[in-house]
Amino acid sequence: MGCTLSAEDKAAVERSKMIDRNLREDGEKAAREVKLLLLGAGESGKSTIVKQMKIIHEAGYSEEECKQYKAVVYSNTIQSIIAIIRAMGRLKIDFGDSARADDARQLFVLAGAAEEGFMTAELAGVIKRLWKDSGVQACFNRSREYQLNDSAAYYLNDLDRIAQSNYIPTQQDVLRTRVKTTGIVETHFTFKDLHFKMFDVGGQRSERKKWIHCFEGVTAIIFCVALSDYDLVLAEDEEMNRMHESMKLFDSICNNKWFTDTSIILFLNKKDLFEEKIKKSPLTICYPEYTGSNTYEEAAAYIQCQFEDLNKRKDTKEIYTHFTCATDTKNVQFVFDAVTDVIIKNNLKDCGLF
């Protein structure tokens, strides 16, 4: 009797092969779909990372889109100088030149127009004179004692350019804008044959209850920490040190049962601001037990250890840490390339393809 397969057997073998092939294709497709959740406390740089994805992996911001940010740039600039002027009263700092008190009064009268996307020559002149004042600069140097936008100096130092009537914000200007994220912002892009869905959620305490339904099927979490927050308090709770709040949040995410199999990528962000700040503001403000030097390398490494030590599953879970400057496109491009390689490796492993 021969070993020839009957037609039914042949069909069954073909069907089996097809099922295997489909399963493999489904597995590969699943391995190519990446759901990334961006988490972190308020103002840690999450939204800036999303903007960088648009610049790096899409066509960036068109001239039309940049124009739409003009009102935000003006609003951020005005709010920054107003925050400094208000803090001067609280910190009992006088203007270097008493004539600036009139400019400060004018500022409050003229501020409304800039919120609408217009910067008059009169308003630009008022802001410029105020920003040059020695008392204003003294107050700016004490900005850890009040809430001030990170981009304050960036915009105020460039007032001549941004006050031009034909001003169109650059990609860097757009990156520097600050708008509080409310709700969830979803971004899609393709990179290294992977289809990314990135979710940016508001970091302020009031926004966190909206995270929960994003948790399912997450490939990786990018958790952003602002290194430069070590000597600041929260906007929503002036008793709470921002770095301690970040650590509390990271602890709850890193050791959450939802994320047992989720890659956790830690972005220690704003390294440029931290490098400047650590020279004059000691790390002991945040970590009284710290005995190291106030050099960037040693202080940054200490903060890294503080976060990584919160991981209660060190034997099975690795934290992938990167030092970042979210406003630096080249740095973000380099880091995201490394992050993607980790995701590819872990994804293939999960799908049994590695």
UniProtKB/Swiss-Prot annotation:
**UniProt region (G2 motif), positions on chain:** 173-181
Q: Which GO terms describe its cellular component?
A: cell cortex; centrosome; cytoplasm; heterotrimeric G-protein complex; midbody; nucleus; plasma membrane
Q: What catalytic activity does the UniProt entry give for this protein? A: GTP + H2O = GDP + phosphate + H(+)
Q: Where is this region: G1 motif?
A: 35-48
- Spell out the residue ranges making up region: G4 motif: 265-272
Q: Where is the G-alpha domain?
A: 32-354
- For this UniProt entry, what is the primary localization, expressed as one broad class? nucleus
Location of this chain's protein in the cell: Nucleus; Cytoplasm; Cell membrane; Cytoplasm, Cytoskeleton, Microtubule organizing center, Centrosome
Q: SUPFAM superfamilies this protein is in?
A: P-loop containing nucleoside triphosphate hydrolases (SSF52540), Transducin (alpha subunit), insertion domain (SSF47895)
Start and end residues of each stretch annotated as G5 motif: 324-329
Lipid attachment, kind N-myristoyl glycine: 2
Q: Which family is this sequence assigned to? A: Belongs to the G-alpha family. G(i/o/t/z) subfamily.
Q: What is this protein called?
A: Guanine nucleotide-binding protein G(i) subunit alpha-1
From which organism does this entry originate? Answer: Cavia porcellus
